[in-house]
Design a protein with these regions (language model features):
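Peripheral (often C-terminal) accessory segments that flank ATP-dependent C-N-forming ligase machineries
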Residues: 2, 286-349
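Short, conserved charged micro-motifs
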Residues: 57-58, 127-130, 159-162, 312-317, ...
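Active-site nucleotide/adenylate-binding loops and adjacent lid/helix of ATP-dependent enzymes
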Residues: 98-184, 188-234
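A short linear hydrophobic-aromatic micro-motif
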Residues: 118, 136-138, 169-174, 244-245, ...
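Protein kinase-like catalytic core scaffold
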Residues: 196, 244, 256-260
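Active-site "cap" helix and flanking loop/linker of ATP-utilizing ligase/carboxylase catalytic domains
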Residues: 225-246, 252, 262-310
Length: 349
């Protein structure tokens, strides 16, 4: 086994799959999580339960690892910055400062000369009234929120009358487009413009939660080239190391927009485990550990189904064929809209 030990902040399914990616390379892992029942602890070599603001526990974690990464981007910046003073954090904490805040993220993308949907900062009710041209639109909290949380759909101006939100938080209003398709580009950057880029993954959402992902995506070649170029520009401008996901919209006129950046491994990339020679998870570990880039090869076309809430019960009792791969996240409690597992179906022959 390698002498290297990676610390992973966060103990959900992405943490579990990162641990498995590290295990493929004989690299040890320590999970730090604020959930004592974190499912990733089963796959790690060691587990530390503690709050992300608990300095004493964080210092104990620092002593046990050689470098640190994370499975989700909403770790407090101060915690990442503290860790980075003693053990290198990859991707670097400064990146999180941008992508933790939706307005900063959109501003960054536009400064790269890359298109997003129209948007405006909202700090008070009068800002909404002054920007009705962006309605229909989505009002989102600038911080936190995922899978539709912290988002308010404004179909028309009259919806403003029924809006009851806390303006002590910052918001962003994004103009809705005539959506044709959503897809993601997952890229692993090894530094110095050395990239491994996975082919576009077409995504479908239900109730603002990812439900289906598939490769190949049914997307025009010109859009594919542009999307890969944009993802590479974003990764290079951030001086990113590791796996990153850029999510895209295509409108009815075939215009391309960046929706958001995920500075980590991504749900849509679960299918890379069974469809590529190297998964997004293993590639992330390779990059942050300074290992050389290996040639990426797609072996199979594939479809991934997210298993949400109570759906997991029936999936646990099913029998699967040799082209189906079921992954149960091992979460202790079943909750509505909670991602409980996934099924990947590969197309052989």
């Amino acid at each position: 086994m390698s002498e290297l030990t990676i610390g992973i902040l966060g103990g959900g399914q992405l943490g579990s799959l990162l641990c498995l990616g590290a295990k493929n390379l004989n690299i040890k892992t320590v999970i730090y999580c604020d959930d004592k029942d974190a499912p990733a602890q089963v796959y790690a070599n060691d587990f530390i339960f503690g709050d992300y603001n608990d300095k004493e526990k964080i210092e104990y974690f620092i002593d046990k690892v050689d470098l640190v990464t994370y499975e989700f981007e909403n770790i407090p910046f101060e915690t990442l910055d503290l860790i980075n003073q003693f053990k290198e954090v990859k991707p670097k904490p400064a990146i999180n400062k941008i992508v933790q805040h939706r307005l900063y993220e959109k501003d960054f993308v536009n400064k790269c000369n890359i298109s997003t949907t129209r948007y405006v900062s909202i700090k008070e009710k009068s800002d909404l009234n002054a920007n009705i041209k962006l309605i229909p639109g989505l009002l989102k909290t600038c911080r936190l929120g995922y899978d539709g949380k912290g988002q308010y759909k404004l179909n028309n101006v009259s919806d403003l009358e029924n809006l009851n939100i806390d303006f002590s938080q910052e918001y962003i209003l994004e103009k809705m487009i005539n959506l044709k398709k959503e897809f993601s580009i997952i890229l692993t950057r090894f530094g110095h413009s050395i990239h491994s880029v996975y082919e576009p993954i077409e995504n479908e959402h239900e109730n603002q939660i990812l439900k289906y992902s598939k490769i190949p995506a049914d997307i025009d070649d010109k859009i594919v080239i542009k999307a890969k170029d944009w993802a590479s520009i974003i990764a290079d401008d951030l001086d990113y190391v590791g796996t990153i996901c850029v999510e895209y919209f295509i409108d009815k006129n075939d215009n391309l927009y960046v929706n958001e950046i995920a500075p980590r491994v991504h749900n849509s990339g679960h299918l890379t485990i069974n469809s590529y020679n190297i998964s997004q998870f293993e590639n992330h570990i390779r990059a942050i550990c300074g290992l050389e880039k290996q040639e990426l090869k797609k072996i199979y076309n594939a479809k991934m189904i997210n298993i949400i809430g109570e759906e997991i019960v029936s999936y646990r009792s099913k029998k699967y064929s040799d082209n189906e791969f079921f992954f149960d996240y091992g979460k202790k409690e079943i909750k509505p809209n909670r991602k409980m597992g996934h099924l990947t179906i590969i197309q052989k022959g």
